[in-house]
Structure formats: C-alpha cells, structure tokens
Amino acid sequence: MMRSRSKSPRRPSPTARGANCDVELLKTTTRDREELKCMLEKYERHLAEIQGNVKVLTSERDKTFLLYEQAQEEIARLRREMKSLARKAMDTESELGRQKAENNSLRLLYENTEKDLSDTQRHLAKKKYELQLTQEKIMCLDEKIDNFTRQNIAQREEISILGGTLNDLAKEKECLQACLDKKSENIASLGESLAMKEKTISGMKNIIAEMEQASRQSTEALIMCEQDISRMRRQLDETNDELAQIARERDILAHDNDNLQEQFAKAKQENQALSKKLNDTHNELNDIKQKVQDTNLEVNKLKNILKSEESENRQMMEQLRKANEDAENWENKARQSEADNNTLKLELITAEAEGNRLKEKVDSLSREVEQHLNAERSYKSQISTLHKSVVKMEEELQKVQFEKVSALADLSSTRELCIKLDSSKELLNRQLVAKDQEIEMMENELDSARSEIELLRSQMTNERISMQNLEALLVANRDKEYQSQIALQEKESEIQLLKEHLCLAENKMAIQSRDVAQFRNVVTQLEADLDITKRQLGTERFERERAVQELRRQNYSSNAYHVSSTMKPNTKCHSPERAHHRSPDRGLDRSLEENLCYRDF
C-alpha cells in the first residue's frame, strides 16, 4: 500500500483506495488460508508423532508394570528365602537395597511419564482449541471477503450510474455551452449593429449640422444681398435726384454716359455670371444631397465640395463688394461730371431709361433671392427627412435594446441552469464523501483484521520455530502456491483494468470540473461585458442629452440672432417687398423649432 501510494503521481480517489484494499485483503486472506492449511497438516503430523510417542510410552509402562510384578514376586520369593535362609540375610540385604534403588528410579520414571502424558494431553487440547478458533476466524474472514466483494460490486454499479449521470451532465453542459456561444454571437452581432447604427447616427448628425451651417450661411448671404439691394435702391434714388440736376449737362456727358452704359453692361454680364454660378451651386447642392441619401461613405467628399462652395460664395461676396466699390467710383465720377457738366439735363430721359433697366436688374436679383429661399426650403425638407431617418434609427436602437433585454433573460436562465448543475454536483460530491467514509470504515475494519492476522502470524511464527522438521512438505505445496499466484496475477490484471477505468472516470470528472470552471469564467466575463456595455450606453445617453441641450442653446441663439436681424430692416423701411422677404426667416425659425421637437421626441 505504501509503495503504491508513493509511486502514484497524484492522490488516488477513494474508489481506487477501496479497490487496492480489496486486492490486498484478497491476497492476505488467501495467503493466511494456505498457511493455516499447512499448519493444520503440520499439527496433524505432530499429533501422529505424539500418538506414536504415547504408544511407545504405554508399551514402556506395561514393561515397567511387568518388571514391577516380577520384582514383587522376587521380593516375595526372597522373603520366603529370608525366612528359609536367615543366614543369607546380609547378602540379600545388599541386594534388597539395590532393588529398592531400582524401584525408586522406576517410580520416578513412572511419575515423569505420567507428567509428560498430562502435558501432552493439555497441549493437544490447546492446539485443538486454537485450530477451532482459527477455523472460525477463517470463516469470519471468508464472510468479510464475500461482503467486501458484494460491496465492490455495488460500488461498481454506483460508479457506472455516476458515470451515466456525469455523461448526462456533460451533454447538458455542451448544450449550455452551445446556447452561450449563440447568445454571445447574438450579443456581438447586436453590439456591432449598435456600433454601426451609432456611427450612422453620428454621421447623420454631422451632416445635419453641416447642412444647418450651410443654411445659416445662405441666410446670411441672403441678408447681405438684401442689404446690397437696399443700398443699390438708395443709390438709384440718389442718382435720380442727381440726374434731375444734371439734365442740363447731357450734351457734354454723352460720351461719359456711353462709357457708363458699357460699364453697366459689364456689370450686368457679371451679375448674370454670378446668378449662373449660384444656380450651378444650387444644382450641385441638390446632387450632393442625393449622394448623402444614397451613401454615407461620401461625407468627406461632400465636406470638400461644401468648402469649395463656401470659397466660391466668399468669392461672390468679394465680387459684390468690388461691384459696390465700382459703383462708389462711378458715383464719384458722376459727382465730378455734375461739377463739370451742368448743361446735360436734356439726357435725363436716357438716364431714366437706364434707371428703369437697373430696376429690372434689381427685380431679377430679387427673383434670384426668392430662388435662394426656395432652395433653402428644399434644404429644410431634406433636413426633416434626415430627422425622420434619425428617428427610425432610434426606434431600431430601442428594438436592439429589447433584444438585449431578451438576451439578458436568456443569460439569467442559463445562470439558473448553472446553479442547478452546481447543486447536483454538490449532491454527487456529498455522495462521494459518504462513500469515502464508508470505505474508511471498511479500511479500519480491515486494519483490525490485519492486526488480528498479524497476531496469528506471530503465533504461527512461534510455532514454526518448533516445527522446522515439516519444511519438506512445503516443497509439495509450492506447486499449489504457484497456481494460486497465477490466479492472483489474473485477478490483479482484472483489478488493474478496473483501476484504469476508475482513473479514466476520475480524469473525466477533472475535465468536467475544469469545463465548469471555464464556464463560470465565461459567465463572469459576459457579466463584465454587459456591465461595460450598460455603462457605455449610459455615457452615450448622457452625451446625447448634452448634445441636444447644446443644439437647443445654439438654435435659441440663432433664433435670437435672426429675430434681431429681421427687426433691424423693419425699423429702417416699411416696404411691402421687405415684408415679403421677411416671411422665409419666420419659416426657418418654425422649421428649426419643429426639428428641435423631433429631436426631443
């Protein structure tokens, strides 16, 4: 036992211990049985020898009895001779003393023989009693061996049942692992879809912010155009007044008027080119919007295009400023012409015609402004569609969250199953502990039996010392021992096979315990991932609410700016055309408020 334990690399299971104990018990019991049989044969032979000695002693006793009778006869004869032969008394007395000494020696021999006979009888009785005890012990050991074999069979059946239960648990574990893999894949796909949707939402928000910035810039450009138109009208009024004064100077300034007409024609061409560029920019903006609706991947291109358009708009503003500067230069020239040409009043008709032409240009510019406003409205409609798409994406996010909740419910069910498996495992462990205790009790009983057997062995060794003459019989019994060893080797091979099966079962149990530990680690990792995703969702919601509040503030500031900008021209002039141009700003404010309502929703 100690060698097998020292050689084993790891601690054997209680079932392996029980099997080893059973094997050793079988070996020891078979050896003890054979030794007891040999001892019985020795005792029988010893008894035969003792009986032979008793027979010899009885024959000697009979001889002594005969000699004693003969001595008595001789004594009687001598007495008769003493009576008859008084003379020969001295001779006979010496003979009588000698015979008395012989009688005493014979009596001592007789007493010694009687004592030896009593001792041998007592020793035989003791040996018979010891033989009966040994036979009873052998019977008890046989019964114990039978009980141990039955217990081994029952334990093997229980081990097979436990193996079946472990296989069922392994199958359930595989099913649960498959379910967990599916759930983890679903969670990963949901996380990826959430990330993609959040990216698309962020892209849409960026596009909306860029569109709003573009609309703001266009409104600012329209305001600047209106201011320029008002300035041009003022300049036209001033030119009409000046032309009334310069009616007398027509003849002298005819050539100057021709030059001015050429410059006006150039300005018209420049304005037409600017209007064409504006129409081209509007068409490009519409194309860009269609591209934005089609693909979200071309956002960077759109940004570059918007930057180029902003640069073109800035160039247009610079050109308008240059035109204003040219107009101022023309006014200076006109003043110089007023000082030089007071006699050109006759050419007022041509100047009025030119003023009418300028009014027509102003009307065309107002039409272009209306077109810009219509384009802004289309921008706003597209922004509303983008908001609707954002709302749809948020609904999809809610659906994904519901799917997450269902996945969490599935995870809770899997946890409950894991708890049930742990409880069943604990029950199995308790059963194994109870069996280990039973095996320990059996081992204690076996130890007590071994101690008794060792005592018997010590007694047998003490008796072997007295019976060394019976070693010749052991040679005949060696063949029987060889056959018994062969049978024991076969039994040991069977026991080794059983040990290997038990080792395989223990390895399976260890693998299953490792799998359960890995399963628990996976469950803890999934719980940590879920906590992280929950925290990320909370932070994203907080950032979303913060962005909504910032958008509200920005829209509130932009609305205040638009209101202040629309109030300024109202204080300056009260023409119906300006009131007509004021209505789109109100529509912009309303659309922005509606967009904010959509975002709040």
Curated annotation (Swiss-Prot):
> Which SUPFAM superfamilies does this UniProt record tie to the protein?
Tropomyosin (SSF57997)
Describe its PTM? Processed into N-terminal 27-kDa and C-terminal 55-kDa fragments.
Q: According to its UniProt record, where is this protein located?
A: Cytoplasm; Cytoplasm, Cytoskeleton, Microtubule organizing center, Centrosome, Centriole
Keywords, in A-Z order: Cytoplasm, Cytoskeleton, Phosphoprotein
Where does the record place Basic and acidic residues bias?
A: 574-588
Q: Give the region (Disordered) as residue ranges.
A: 1-20, 563-588
What ranges does the record list as Polar residues composition bias?
Answer: 563-573
Record's Gene Ontology CC terms? Answer: centriole; cytoplasm
Family from the record: Belongs to the CEP135/TSGA10 family.
Role description: Plays a role in spermatogenesis. When overexpressed, prevents nuclear localization of HIF1A.
Q: What is this protein called?
A: Testis-specific gene 10 protein
> What is the organism field in this record?
Macaca fascicularis (Crab-eating macaque)
Q: Which lineage is the organism of this entry classified under, starting from the top rank?
A: Eukaryota, Metazoa, Chordata, Craniata, Vertebrata
